[in-house]
C-alpha cells in the first residue's frame, strides 16, 4: 500500500506543476485578448503566491484537524476550480479572483505532501517528489500545444488541465483509506519503522 500511495503522491506533484507554466506560455496571446499590459502577468502570479503563502501557514492546523488525504483532495479540487475559472475568464479581474483559490490549493498540496513524504518515506523520495513537479511544469505547455494544434484556444488549455485536476480529485477521494493505514518504511540504518 505504501508504494501505491507514493505513486499517487507523485501524480499529485505532477498535477501541481501542470498549471504553473501555463500562464507564461499563454500570456503573449492572452494579454492582448483581455487588453492589459504584459506586466499584468505579475499581478496574477503575485496573488497566486499570496494564496500559496496563506495555505502554507495554515497547513499544520489543517493537517491535524482533517488529515493529509482530505486536505490534499480539497486542495487539488481548489486548483481544479481555479483552472476552470481561468478557462472562462475574459477580464483581468477574473484572473485575479481565480488566482486566490489556485494559490490556496497549490500551497496546500505542496506543504501537506512535502510534510507527509518527509515523515513517512525515505529521504530519496523527497528528491523524486520535486522531480515530479518538474515533469508537470514541463508537460503543461505540451498539453496547451496539443490543444492549440487541434484548434482549441488558451481557454481550452486551462479547461483540459481543470479536467485532469478533477479526475485526480476523484482518485484522491477514493484513496482516502490508504492515507489512514500505517505504512512500514526502512530508515537510514536499515531498521523497519512503522510510520
Which residues does each PLM region occupy?
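MFS-fold secondary transporters
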Residues: 82-86, 102, 172
Amino acid at each position: 500500500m505504501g508504494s501505491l500511495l507514493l505513486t499517487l503522491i507523485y501524480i499529485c506533484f505532477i498535477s501541481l506543476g501542470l498549471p504553473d507554466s501555463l500562464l507564461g506560455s499563454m500570456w503573449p496571446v492572452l494579454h492582448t485578448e483581455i487588453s492589459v499590459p504584459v506586466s499584468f502577468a505579475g499581478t496574477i502570479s503575485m496573488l497566486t503566491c499570496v494564496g500559496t503563502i496563506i495555505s502554507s501557514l495554515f497547513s499544520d492546523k489543517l493537517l491535524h484537524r482533517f488529515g493529509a488525504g482530505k486536505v490534499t483532495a480539497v486542495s487539488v479540487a481548489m486548483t481544479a476550480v481555479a483552472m476552470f475559472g481561468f478557462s472562462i475568464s475574459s477580464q483581468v479581474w477574473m484572473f485575479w479572483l481565480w488566482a486566490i483559490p489556485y494559490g490556496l490549493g497549490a500551497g496546500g498540496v505542496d506543504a501537506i505532501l512535502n510534510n507527509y513524504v518527509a515523515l513517512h518515506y525515505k529521504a530519496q523520495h523527497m528528491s523524486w517528489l520535486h522531480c515530479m513537479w518538474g515533469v508537470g511544469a514541463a508537460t503543461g505547455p505540451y498539453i496547451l500545444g496539443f490543444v492549440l494544434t487541434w484548434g482549441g484556444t488558451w481557454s481550452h488549455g486551462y479547461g483540459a488541465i481543470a479536467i485532469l485536476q478533477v479526475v485526480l480529485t476523484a482518485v484522491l477521494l477514493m484513496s482516502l483509506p490508504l492515507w489512514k493505514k500505517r505504512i512500514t518504511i526502512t530508515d537510514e540504518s536499515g531498521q523497519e519503522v512503522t510510520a
